[in-house]
């Protein structure tokens, strides 16, 4: 698996106007059609371009090794779980290396991944994940994000709240020396959360993968080695 985009950059594709399509949906379609990571994901069999963000995080921080237990929050359609499954060499029925994936949306089956179509904020979801783990987790991943409304401050706060919930959950289930990786949007309100994370992990970094769109304020919180 590589993040090399050689051969995936095509000529610019224009999107014809349509009375049935809003301006925002036309802009989204144009962006998708001209995104080399979308093309690369389709050719290489990944379910979303987000797979390359996790690949970049791993390439820089070396977070995955074989025989790990991983929790993937906000997992649909499954791009991160696909990457994690390959990197830990997950197989169905192996209790030592497995991935637990959770999302409101259905996740099509992935080898070595146990998926739950659940709201992470429902009372029984945490217990469901803990029972499925049959022990502690080595990594908690969260690519959860609220539906954006185009108002940066609001989008920032909403996604930050999701990150805080994922962090509190990670503290409950992570092994000592475990890792926590989560998406946040820059906006200024994240400093309090960062201070909390730094008290619990030996190394805390911000990272923006090259596969993250330049215009996006998203970055990834990389917290390594739970104290």
UniProtKB/Swiss-Prot annotation:
Active site: 183 (proton acceptor)
Protein known as: Ribosomal RNA large subunit methyltransferase E
Family: Belongs to the class I-like SAM-binding methyltransferase superfamily. RNA methyltransferase RlmE family.
Binding site for S-adenosyl-L-methionine: 78, 80, 103, 119, 143
Gene name as annotated: rlmE
Function according to Swiss-Prot or TrEMBL: Specifically methylates the uridine in position 2552 of 23S rRNA at the 2'-O position of the ribose in the fully assembled 50S ribosomal subunit.
Sorted UniProt keywords: Cytoplasm, Methyltransferase, rRNA processing, S-adenosyl-L-methionine, Transferase
Record localization: Cytoplasm
Catalytic activity, as annotated: uridine(2552) in 23S rRNA + S-adenosyl-L-methionine = 2'-O-methyluridine(2552) in 23S rRNA + S-adenosyl-L-homocysteine + H(+)
Known EC number: 2.1.1.166
Catalytic class of the enzyme: transferase
GO MF annotations, alphabetized: rRNA (uridine-2'-O-)-methyltransferase activity
One family name in Pfam for this protein: FtsJ
Gene3D superfamilies: Vaccinia Virus protein VP39
GO cellular component: cytoplasm
InterPro entries named in the record: RNA_methyltr_RlmE, RNA_MeTrfase_FtsJ_dom, rRNA-MeTfrase_E, SAM-dependent_MTases_sf
Organism for this UniProt entry: Rickettsia bellii (strain OSU 85-389)
